[in-house]
From Swiss-Prot:
Gene, per the UniProt record: mnmA
Name under which the protein is recorded: tRNA-specific 2-thiouridylase MnmA
Keyword Iron-sulfur applies: no
Function in brief: Catalyzes the 2-thiolation of uridine at the wobble position (U34) of tRNA, leading to the formation of s(2)U34.
Primary location: cytoplasm
Active site: C101, C199
Family, similarity comment: Belongs to the MnmA/TRMU family.
Region (Interaction with tRNA): 149-151
The organism of origin for this protein: Corynebacterium diphtheriae (strain ATCC 700971 / NCTC 13129 / Biotype gravis)
Gene Ontology terms: cellular component: cytoplasm
Entry-linked Gene3D superfamilies: Adenine nucleotide alpha hydrolases-like domains, HUPs, Translation factors
Biological process annotations from GO: tRNA wobble position uridine thiolation
Lineage: Bacteria, Bacillati, Actinomycetota, Actinomycetes, Mycobacteriales
Protein residues bound to ATP: A6, M7, S8, G9, G10, V11, D12, S13, L32, G125
Keyword Ribosomal protein attributed: no
Length: 366
């Protein structure tokens, strides 16, 4: 097959590309330029779109003897990821920009251009697996065999079309072995640290970034009874489950710590309460993605609402008429926020299968 290897400049994508070459595919490496000013992305920030990352990706492709290109997706990245991130916080949500980047840029936009140029698939270094059903057809997305690095959650927001054109060559290997393989091939990125920061906020100061783009929008912090506790500069400063940085002088009546339990973006009201007030027993999600035939009607499954977060058993009711699902949690979860992705899994001894996902739009508490 003729495949595009998405080269982030890290060790995982390097080994994924190498394995695709070894498998006999016609491979072309491509690095996505996502920053409109890559000079501002510090090399020490562990982002994924710095100039150094691009140089690392080029060196890997040179060693593999495959063509290398840089595609500028910075305008689309700003619109679909950065602007979406800002507007989500304005709406009182807690978005994950890496999920949006996967959904809109690293797969949808990349595939759109790749298919137009005659490529059959995209190869990435994500830790996930695709297995073919016994009756043929498109593969099912499964967890990686490395539970510490599994990225099936962040891929659960993809559509069936994207999954059908994906290859994840490193999903059947644990990370230490990937580094060993990279070192054996002489890749300079073999010991390169993993990236964790939001690439467009390289200093990690999300509040300062949002403050520059949203500005002051004063509102009140209130307790669960509606008593006003203090004024704040903007509800975007807060996320569900937040404890630190509230700076409330008046202690709670029971003396226990307070947590952000609700954000009303329309009024700018931030509600705080006890840890017990955080426990969610059910959620509603919209913008559904269907990745498996079992993602229909009512069924029992498991749900994950954060990358590397807890996985709990649940009862799912999919309403395809309005593209929503209700998920009743068998074990309450804390810190569940609107804007997060709820990814549904079917437990399986060979690796849990991703059935689909949705964006959380409402929660119900104990």
């Amino acid at each position: 097959m003729r495949v595009l290897a998405a080269m982030s400049g890290g060790v995982d994508s390097a080994v994924a590309a190498a394995r695709a070459v070894a498998a006999g595919h016609d491979v072309v490496g491509v690095h996505l330029a996502l920053s409109q000013d890559p000079q501002t992305v510090r090399e020490s920030s562990r982002g994924c779109c710095s100039l150094e990352d691009s140089a690392d990706a080029r060196r890997v492709c040179d060693k593999l003897g495959i063509p290398f290109y840089v595609w500028d997706f910075s305008d689309r990245f700003k619109e679909d990821v950065i602007d979406d991130f800002i507007s989500s916080y304005e709406a009182g949500e807690t978005p994950n920009p890496c999920l949006r980047c996967n959904e809109k840029i690293k797969f949808a936009a990349l595939l759109e251009r790749g298919i137009a140029l005659g490529f059959d698939a995209v190869v990435t270094g994500h830790y996930a697996r695709l297995t073919q059903p016994v009756d043929g057809g498109d593969g099912y997305l499964r967890r990686s065999i490395d539970p510490d690095k599994d990225q099936s959650y962040v891929l659960g927001v993809l559509g069936a079309h994207e999954i059908a054109h994906c290859m994840f060559p490193v999903g059947d290997t644990v990370k230490p072995k990937i580094r060993e393989e990279a070192a054996a091939m002489g890749f300079s990125v073999a010991k390169k640290p993993d990236s964790y920061d939001i690439c467009f906020i390289p200093d990690g100061n999300t509040q300062a970034f949002l403050g520059r783009h949203i500005g002051l929008r004063p509102g009140m912090i209130v307790d669960s009874d509606g008593n006003e506790l203090k004024e704040h500069d903007g509800a975007w400063n807060y996320t569900i489950g937040q404890r630190k940085g509230l700076d409330i002088k008046q202690p709670a009546a029971d003396g226990k710590p307070r947590y952000v339990t609700n954000i009303d973006a329309a009024t700018g009201t931030v509600t705080v309460g006890s840890r017990e007030n955080l426990k969610v027993i059910a959620l509603t999600a919209d913008r559904l993605k269907y990745l498996h035939p079992a993602m229909t009607g009512s069924f029992e499954a498991e749900v994950q609402v954060r990358a590397h977060g807890s996985v709990v058993a649940c009862s799912v009711m999919v309403n395809e008429s309005d593209d929503t699902m209700r998920v009743e949690l068998h074990t309450p979860l804390s810190g569940v926020a609107r804007g997060q992705a709820a990814v549904i899994y079917l437990p399986d001894d060979d690796g849990d299968i991703v059935l689909g996902s949705g964006t959380i739009c409402a929660t119900e508490h104990q």
